[in-house]
């Protein structure tokens, strides 16, 4: 009888393991905890699809889970020469992943690999629920709190989650996030596409910073003229986008259901105007903070993800080397990101309101 009971228990464990959507998993020890890395089966457009993921648990877990939503479309990450250095489930490691683990949070992220917008939110929501279940299956309790941290396109997903998923996520940290304000984005892109051919340094070298066309372009992007070295990346992209049909996209509701903190650089000509517009119309205002870090571009200069931008700028877009250099030479918003995450956690878990929205110097403490 005892042998029969043991056999039943083993069989039950095997059935549970077989039912886990986390397949091809490799478990290892990492600094500060343990890591599970492999493929997870998710349902996208009515069918199962396997996506790369990472799930880390700290040696001393604080009971909360942080979900990372990477930028871009997903897939491979490159160094400046074009060599593949990783895939996007680990893209936010140096931004928030390792930091969260060191603070006692479980951390998980999935490579959406081409899935964005509402479908990207659906994928991220599925993944989050599966992670919560998997943690319980592995002997941990269900996370008490779940936070979403998104960068760029992943920030757009975090924004949608903050507006639409109050039962799953307790707080959102958005870094240089997309999806701020559609009307402002369309205005920015239209003006940039019209103005860029008039100041493109490849055709108009040496235009002084005080020239009216330069200041008009600065106003269109929402960035100072000092950010001029970085403009060719988005300027050329805006011209290319203007030749394509405008796709259908809905505007963000700007109605937050959970505490939300945003961090962005003041030289971020991809999203800064939209985020300022979003901050102006967001409701309720006491659920939102916007921290702008002076002189920082869309990607922090010390984020290894900037190398993919450098590779695209030089090798694919054929922009001048100076543009790629400028991307990597800028200051960092990572200290503000991590400080913001701490404020978000305190806001959610103790009710302590974070500092008011403000503009800060790199490495300066929020006040």
Indicate where each model-derived feature is located.
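Gly/Ser-rich "nucleophile elbow"/oxyanion-hole loop immediately N-terminal to the catalytic nucleophile
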Residues: 58-63, 127-152, 168
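Short, solvent-exposed loop/turn and secondary-structure capping segments
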Residues: 76-86, 118-121, 137, 159-162, ...
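Primarily recognizes the serine-hydrolase "nucleophile elbow" in alpha/beta-hydrolase
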Residues: 144-196
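Conserved alpha/beta-hydrolase
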Residues: 95-114, 344
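Accessory cap/linker subdomain of secreted extracellular hydrolases
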Residues: 20-55, 173-255, 331-334, 355-359, ...
């Amino acid at each position: 009888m005892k042998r029969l009971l043991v056999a039943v228990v083993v069989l039950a464990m095997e059935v549970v393991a077989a039912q886990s959507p986390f397949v091809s998993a490799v478990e290892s020890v990492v600094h500060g905890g343990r890591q599970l890395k492999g493929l997870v089966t998710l349902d996208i457009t009515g069918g199962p699809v396997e996506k790369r993921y990472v799930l880390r648990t700290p040696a001393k877990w604080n009971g909360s889970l942080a979900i990372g939503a990477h930028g871009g479309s997903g897939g491979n990450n490159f160094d400046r020469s074009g060599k593949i250095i990783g895939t996007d489930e680990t893209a936010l490691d140096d931004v928030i992943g390792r930091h969260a683990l060191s603070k006692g949070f479980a951390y998980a992220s999935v490579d959406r690999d081409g899935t964005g917008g509402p479908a990207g939110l659906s994928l991220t929501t599925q993944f989050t629920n599966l992670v919560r279940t998997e943690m319980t299956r592995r002997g941990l309790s269900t996370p008490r709190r779940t936070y979403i941290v998104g960068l760029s396109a992943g920030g757009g997903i975090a924004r949608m989650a903050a507006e639409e998923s109050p039962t799953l996520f307790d707080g959102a940290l958005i870094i240089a996030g997309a999806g701020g304000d559609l009307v402002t984005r369309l205005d920015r892109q239209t003006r940039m596409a019209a103005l860029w051919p008039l100041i493109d340094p490849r055709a108009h070298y040496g235009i002084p910073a005080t020239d009216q066309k330069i200041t008009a372009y600065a106003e269109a992007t929402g960035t100072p003229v000092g950010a001029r070295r970085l403009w060719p990346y988005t300027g050329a992209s805006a011209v290319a986008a203007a030749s394509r049909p405008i796709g259908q996209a809905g505007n963000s509701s700007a109605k937050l259901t959970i505490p939300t903190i945003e961090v962005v650089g003041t030289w971020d000509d991809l999203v800064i105007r939209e985020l300022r517009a979003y901050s102006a119309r967001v409701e309720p205002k006491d659920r939102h903070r916007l921290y702008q870090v002076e002189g920082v571009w869309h990607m922090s200069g010390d984020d290894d993800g900037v190398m993919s931008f450098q590779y695209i700028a030089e090798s694919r877009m054929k922009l001048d080397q100076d543009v790629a250099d400028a991307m990597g030479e800028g200051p960092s918003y990572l200290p503000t990101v991590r400080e913001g995450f701490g404020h978000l956690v305190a806001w959610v878990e103790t009710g302590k309101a974070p500092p008011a929205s403000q503009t800060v110097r790199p490495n300066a403490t929020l006040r």
